């Protein structure tokens, strides 16, 4: 489930609520999903979102939530697991996100171990060689010797450049934390971190791993590998081996066996005939030792110089590993200036029985297995001191050929004749050496092999005790008693398979462990080994499943006999829990790919490969997230190979048959088994026992019962899910029906609207047609009118006068002449012309008659059209009411249906309202008696007189050890805070109840009050005063200023509330031990008074107490959470068992160092709280919680935010001092000038003036004494350290007459003042305060004389009303005057009696 940034903000970064919501949504139980994975998903998402989110750019809330999560117990395992998974699977996508996440881890203080816990002298003497004269005495304590190897390992790792991430992270850790880290790396297969931490890189040229077979030619092994074996416990052996083998392919060949560890045993046996030549060579070599020593001395001097240079370069406090006990005598590794910081010391190894001088180097194991060491160079003194520890620890003899230095124990003679030989000349030394060599060789030739074996085993038994419980001890022990490397691998991997009484080891089936070596060297092994489950070797090991699969497949690749495959399958049948295991699809794919790469398998078993590939593709497509069963995989392979599985036969009989001596097959590795130490009697005992007992049947029954239980659980879950789904489906159907019912009337309305729109469109079309017709009629009428006009014109022409007629006749005659001329041109006959003339009037009459007829027809058409329109209108009028009726009927039906639905909904609502009314009626009494309602649902709790609800919305706070605080009611009347605590922590509960009862009886106004106590089987419930919010809530939500304004108090008065509460605790010998802003609560007057008045019958009170103590002022602070407090009887020291962790940064050094705690612990916490209050949420040791503890340990304080208020700085700086003896008592805190009232400040000014007068009188001069001069100079307090010193800067940068209104305030005064002297300023302030009434009277007279008084006079007149306003005026003009006088007069507090009350 992916979480959005908005969801995280909604839950206010409460990851537990998010996790619960996740489980509910997915129907998961707590065992099926991990809370840690939910948190890590949220944190990674926030790392990606917050840097780009403008709304939440600060990310302070995220950082606080992150480190709260980091402080939980599973942090390191989770981070390493997530880092390994993300980097191996999706490195390209998620590396950037996790880099941001891991960068925060590097700065974390969760595993902080103080560097000062280690003995700094030991560190400097052993690991930081600042000069060659740092000697370690031979009589060191045993404790220093025991921790040498551990510190040697961790320092050699921390100095590694390639592991900078982890080395910075674990800079201040101890050796045990490093082992824990390595265990987690092994557990979660975090190979990347392992490479960085232990320098396992192929590409590194400087620190390249050199691991080769332990043969006679090359005996080199990496120190890093053996160091891993040193710090690895047996339980985590298999993951360690996977990491080692992945990075060192030849590691299996270099595992020490008896032949490789005790040396040169077989070499000497093979070369018995050449002993004389060896002795001669040895003598020659010994004769040349003197020459070699001279050269080596020069080299060693250079080496010492280089060591000094390296130490000077690395003098920043980092522990550097200057040397490592491995080396190679090559010229390129001379100790020149360019050589690395690792100074390798070449040495030779000598066995007391077999003298060997031809070897030039030795591996790490032979160094510890040899009984003596001789160096062919001069040994550095500091290096020799460390080797001396090895000699003491393991009993080795060490010798150097150097002339300058020789170890007191002579190497050449094991008896008592060694000391004298060391003092002889070089020739004598050579002779003695030759004699000793000859004696040793003779002894070697004369000793029997059996005695050699016994001595060798005795020496190895000594080494088994080195780092007991680690893999290196197992290597030593198994190499001493067995001959085969398979035993060591078996032990390293923890594969002591089955019960050793009747089951054999798989490793004994193969010669020299070839098959398992092949599978471990496979390039796919790293994925197959990644099993998330982990169990110790004594339990069933699910991590063996991939090994068994590959071992079985390797049999095929090596073309082994199928009988061996039967043995593997029988082993799985005997260990059925392993057989029923599963592998992931990725592992299955790796198996298929591995088989494809094997040519022999591809040739012989192609059908099996195709089937496996088909199964893999099928599973990958359909169910890629589901694992694949092991038994199915083995069954498929086995059927194709025709290797039967013994299901119904006796398993042990088949195994016994395999071990019989008669079974001989030259091609089978079983032929060598008779030579091995196989106990056949144990196998036969197992056979008889299995025949007599029904052990397998019992196992089958148990498995069947488990299956039935799991099936039942699954069925129950299915039924529950089905019920939930049915309910959801029903709800969905009801919602759909409702929507449909609402949609039907809407659809009808839409349909009606469509019909109306269509009718409107038709009407519009008809209107348009009518308009067109009307236009046509108008055109016709116009034409008729024109014709009529023409006719009228003709008639008028006929009626014209004779003149006009004559004119017309003349015109006509002209026309006729023209016509005649035309006729002539056309050659027309005269009769034709006459006919034309006669036809003209007839044509005219015909035209007129035709026009009349057309006009009549048009009129008739218009009449018909009008009649049709009338008829249509009538029809429409008749149809409209019918349509309206239909629509109205439809609307009525819809309204009826809607009303029915509304009535149904109303009924449902009424039922809900009735239920709610019933609830309200049932809780009316609670409503009337209390300020809030408790809903009686599933989470409702009623215990004794307490009633509350366990819903999360009703939780007021959470504490340690599962403590919860609920909002509830006591006696059905009084609202209280109910604190639920587990009975498993009875000491704390009794302690808190005892403290609360005593405080309640004493009636403290600034402490939370105890009301009542109830308990049940599991919990104890305490009723406490119900408060509003905490100081932390006010600050974080920006409501502190609002609270101060509404309280009617100043900031100093509110701070005094907290101090009064602490004073009350200390006066009754109670140390709170856990003061922080969360435990400072707010309480209003009304609420407190009501609660106190109603609970008087239950609470015991003192009859002699004052009435004022029962009433709190408006919005005061009170102290709560006394779960960690301690009632003191004999002294003021607190020895609580449940010590605070100090993670919030409100505990001093002594708490972090688990020392005894006194009242000064509360003083330190109170100082941090006062700084928090005065600066609105800041911390004196930094706001970043990562570095608070670090800054507290180093006393890095920053009070610059209070630079304007030097009194507060002075008080807080003394309260948070690193030295508890320098912190003030609570009475001294209350007596500090920061909390003085006006009267006490005026008294202090009078006392200062008296001292100035006495100093003048004693000095004999006119104010020239040292004290009065010192008043003029500034006294500076350092805001970041404890060092305070006076400076030569003047207290005032200008004369004080320019700072105050001297003219108006000195009216009527005849005194003279020096404005550059502070003593005169004190005298002026004192005179103004004493004579302020006279000064005010004179100023008022001036105002009366002036017609318009100035603003300055009015202001001064207002100031002189009382002493408070006057002192406030001077403090505003000269802010730090009281602080300056307080610090200057502190030296004289013991000399003058009237000053004692101001400083005690």
From Swiss-Prot:
Region of interest called Disordered, as start-end residue ranges on this chain: 267-320, 416-457, 707-746, 802-887, 1084-1113
Membrane-spanning residues: none
Catalysed reactions, semicolon-separated: L-seryl-[protein] + ATP = O-phospho-L-seryl-[protein] + ADP + H(+); L-threonyl-[protein] + ATP = O-phospho-L-threonyl-[protein] + ADP + H(+)
Annotated positions binding ATP: 956-964, 979
Keywords: ATP-binding, Coiled coil, Kinase, Nucleotide-binding, Serine/threonine-protein kinase, Transferase
A single GO cellular-component term on record: IRE1-TRAF2-ASK1 complex
Domain of life: Eukaryota
Biased composition (Low complexity): 270-316, 416-453, 802-851, 1086-1113
UniProt entry tagged with the keyword Kinase: yes
GO MF annotations in UniProt: ATP binding; protein serine kinase activity; protein serine/threonine kinase activity; RNA endonuclease activity; unfolded protein binding
GO biological process assignments: IRE1-mediated unfolded protein response; mRNA processing
Every KEN domain range: 1238-1400
Coiled coil regions in record: 689-801, 842-933
Residue ranges with Basic and acidic residues bias: 863-882
Name of this chain's protein: Probable serine/threonine-protein kinase irlF
Upper classification of the organism: Eukaryota, Amoebozoa, Evosea, Eumycetozoa, Dictyostelia
């Amino acid at each position: 489930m992916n979480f959005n940034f908005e969801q995280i903000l909604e839950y206010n970064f409460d990851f537990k609520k998010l996790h619960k919501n996740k489980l509910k949504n997915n129907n998961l139980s707590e065992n099926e999903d991990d809370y840690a994975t939910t948190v890590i998903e949220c944190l990674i998402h926030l790392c990606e979102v917050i840097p780009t989110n403008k709304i939440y750019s600060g990310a302070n809330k995220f950082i606080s939530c992150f480190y709260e999560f980091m402080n939980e117990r599973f942090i390191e395992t989770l981070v390493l697991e997530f880092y390994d998974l993300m980097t191996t699977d999706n490195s390209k996508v998620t590396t950037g996100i996790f880099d941001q996440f891991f960068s925060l881890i590097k700065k974390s203080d969760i595993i902080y171990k103080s560097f000062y816990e280690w003995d700094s002298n030991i560190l400097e003497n052993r690991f930081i060689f600042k000069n060659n004269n740092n000697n370690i005495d031979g009589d060191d304590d045993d404790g220093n010797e025991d921790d040498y190897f551990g510190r040697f390992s961790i320092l050699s790792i921390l100095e590694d450049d390639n592991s900078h991430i982890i080395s910075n992270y674990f800079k201040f850790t101890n050796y045990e934390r490093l082992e824990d880290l390595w265990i987690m790396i092994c557990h979660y297969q975090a190979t990347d971190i392992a490479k960085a931490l232990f320098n396992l890189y192929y590409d590194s040229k400087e620190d390249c791993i050199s691991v080769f077979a332990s043969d006679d030619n090359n005996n080199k092994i990496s120190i890093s590998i053996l160091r891993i074996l040193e710090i690895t416990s047996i339980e985590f052996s298999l993951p360690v081996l996977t990491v080692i083998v992945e990075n060192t392919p030849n590691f299996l060949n270099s595992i020490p066996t008896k032949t490789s560890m005790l040396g040169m045993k077989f070499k000497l046996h093979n070369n018995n005939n050449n002993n004389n030549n060896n002795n001669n060579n040895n003598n020659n070599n010994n004769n040349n030792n003197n020459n070699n020593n001279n050269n080596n001395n020069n080299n060693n001097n250079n080496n010492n110089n280089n060591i000094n240079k390296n130490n000077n370069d690395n003098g920043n406090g980092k522990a550097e590993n200057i040397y490592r006990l491995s080396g190679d005598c090559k010229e390129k590794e001379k100790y020149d200036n360019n050589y690395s910081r690792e100074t390798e010391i070449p040495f030779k190894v000598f066995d007391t029985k077999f003298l060997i001088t031809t070897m030039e180097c030795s591996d790490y194991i032979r160094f510890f297995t040899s009984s003596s060491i001789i160096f062919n160079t001069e040994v550095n003194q500091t290096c020799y001191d460390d080797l001396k520890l090895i000699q003491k620890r393991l009993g080795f003899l060490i010798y150097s050929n150097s002339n300058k230095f020789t170890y007191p124990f002579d190497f050449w003679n094991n008896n008592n004749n060694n000391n004298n030989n060391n003092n002889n000349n070089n020739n004598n030394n050579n002779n003695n050496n030759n004699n000793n060599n000859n004696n040793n060789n003779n002894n070697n030739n004369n000793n029997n092999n059996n005695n050699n074996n016994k001595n060798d085993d005795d020496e190895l038994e000594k080494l088994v005790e080195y780092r007991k419980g680690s893999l290196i001890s197992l290597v030593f022990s198994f190499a001493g008693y067995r001959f085969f490397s398979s035993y060591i691998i078996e032990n390293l991997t923890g594969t002591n398979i089955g019960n050793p009484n009747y089951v054999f080891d798989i490793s004994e089936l193969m010669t020299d462990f070839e098959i398992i070596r092949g599978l471990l060297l496979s390039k796919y092994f790293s994925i197959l080994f990644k099993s998330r489950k982990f169990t110790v070797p004594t339990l069933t090991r699910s991590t063996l499943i991939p090994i068994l699969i590959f071992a079985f497949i390797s049999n095929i690749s090596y073309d082994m006999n199928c009988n061996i495959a039967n043995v593997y399958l029988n082993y799985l049948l005997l260990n059925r829990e392993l057989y029923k295991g599963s592998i992931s699809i990725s592992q299955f794919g790796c198996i298929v790919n591995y088989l494809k790469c094997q040519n022999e398998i591809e040739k012989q078993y192609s059908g099996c490969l195709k089937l496996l590939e088909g199964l893999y593709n099928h599973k990958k497509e359909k169910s890629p997230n589901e694992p694949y069963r092991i038994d199915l995989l083995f069954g498929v392979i086995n059927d194709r190979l025709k290797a039967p599985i013994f299901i119904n036969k006796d398993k042990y009989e088949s195994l016994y048959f395999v071990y019989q001596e008669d079974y001989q097959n030259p091609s089978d590795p079983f032929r060598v088994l008779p030579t091995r130490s196989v106990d056949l009697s144990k196998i036969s005992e197992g056979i008889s026992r299995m025949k007599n007992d029904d052990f397998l049947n019992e196992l089958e029954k148990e498995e069947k019962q488990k299956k039935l239980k799991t099936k039942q659980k699954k069925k129950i879950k299915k039924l529950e899910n089905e019920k939930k789904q049915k309910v959801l489906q029903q709800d969905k159907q009801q919602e759909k029906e409702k929507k449909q019912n609402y949609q039907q009337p809407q659809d009808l309305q839409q349909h009606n609207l469509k019909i109306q729109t269509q009718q409107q469109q038709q009407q519009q079309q008809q209107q348009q047609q009518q308009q067109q017709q009307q236009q046509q009629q108008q055109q016709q009428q116009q034409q008729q009118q024109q014709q009529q006009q023409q006719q009228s014109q003709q008639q008028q022409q006929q009626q014209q006068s004779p003149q006009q007629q004559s004119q017309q006749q003349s015109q006509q005659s002209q026309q006729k002449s023209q016509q005649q001329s035309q006729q002539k041109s056309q050659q027309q006959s005269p009769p034709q012309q006459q006919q034309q003339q006669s036809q003209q009037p007839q044509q005219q009459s015909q035209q007129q008659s035709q026009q009349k007829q057309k006009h009549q027809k048009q009129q008739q058409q218009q009449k018909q059209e009008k009649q049709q329109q009338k008829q249509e209108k009538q029809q429409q009028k008749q149809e409209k009411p019918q349509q309206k009726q239909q629509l109205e009927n439809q609307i009525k039906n819809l309204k009826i249906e809607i009303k029915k639905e509304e009535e149904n909904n109303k009924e449902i609502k009424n039922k809900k309202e009735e239920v709610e009314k019933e609830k309200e009626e049932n809780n009316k009494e609670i409503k009337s008696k209390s300020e809030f309602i408790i809903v009686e649902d599933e989470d409702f709790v009623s215990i004794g007189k307490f009633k509350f609800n366990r819903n999360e919305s009703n939780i007021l706070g959470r504490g340690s050890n599962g403590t919860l605080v609920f909002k509830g009611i006591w006696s059905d009347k009084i609202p209280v805070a109910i604190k639920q605590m587990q009975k498993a922590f009875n000491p704390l509960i009794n302690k808190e109840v005892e403290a609360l009862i005593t405080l309640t009886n004493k009636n403290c106004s600034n402490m939370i009050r105890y009301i009542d106590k109830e308990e049940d089987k599991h919990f104890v419930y305490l009723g406490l005063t119900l408060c509003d919010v905490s100081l932390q809530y006010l600050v974080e939500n920006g409501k502190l200023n609002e609270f101060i304004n509404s309280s009617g108090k100043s900031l100093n008065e509110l701070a005094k509330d907290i101090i009064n509460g602490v004073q009350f605790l200390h006066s009754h010998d109670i140390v709170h031990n856990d003061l922080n802003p969360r435990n400072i609560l707010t309480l209003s007057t009304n609420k407190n008074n009501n609660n106190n008045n109603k609970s008087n019958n239950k609470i015991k009170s003192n009859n002699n107490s004052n009435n004022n103590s029962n009433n709190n002022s408006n919005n005061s602070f009170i102290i709560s959470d006394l779960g960690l407090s301690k009632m003191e009887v004999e002294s003021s020291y607190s020895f609580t068992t449940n010590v605070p962790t100090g993670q919030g940064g409100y505990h001093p050094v002594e708490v972090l160092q688990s020392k005894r705690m006194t009242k000064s612990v509360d003083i330190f916490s109170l100082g941090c709280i006062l700084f928090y209050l005065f600066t609105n949420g800041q911390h004196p040791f930094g706001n970043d919680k990562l570095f608070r503890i670090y800054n507290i340990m180093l006393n890095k304080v920053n009070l610059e935010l209070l630079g304007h208020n030097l009194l507060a700085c002075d008080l807080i700086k003394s309260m948070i001092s690193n030295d508890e003896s320098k912190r003030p008592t609570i009475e001294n805190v209350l007596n500090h000038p920061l909390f003085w009232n006006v009267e006490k400040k005026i008294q202090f000014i009078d006392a200062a003036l008296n001292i100035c007068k006495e100093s003048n009188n004693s000095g004999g001069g006119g104010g020239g004494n040292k004290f009065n001069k010192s008043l003029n100079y500034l006294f500076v307090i350092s805001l970041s350290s404890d060092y305070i010193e006076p400076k030569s800067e003047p207290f005032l940068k200008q004369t004080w007459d320019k700072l105050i209104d001297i003219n108006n305030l000195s009216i009527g005064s005849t005194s003279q003042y020096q404005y550059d002297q502070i003593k005169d300023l004190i005298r002026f302030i004192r005179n103004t305060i004493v004579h302020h009434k006279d000064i005010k009277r004179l100023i008022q007279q001036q105002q009366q004389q002036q017609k318009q008084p100035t603003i300055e006079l009015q202001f001064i007149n207002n100031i002189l009303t009382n002493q408070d306003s006057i002192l406030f005026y001077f403090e505003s003009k000269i802010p730090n005057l009281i602080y300056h006088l307080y610090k200057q007069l502190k030296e004289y507090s013991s000399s003058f009696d009237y000053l004692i009350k101001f400083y005690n």
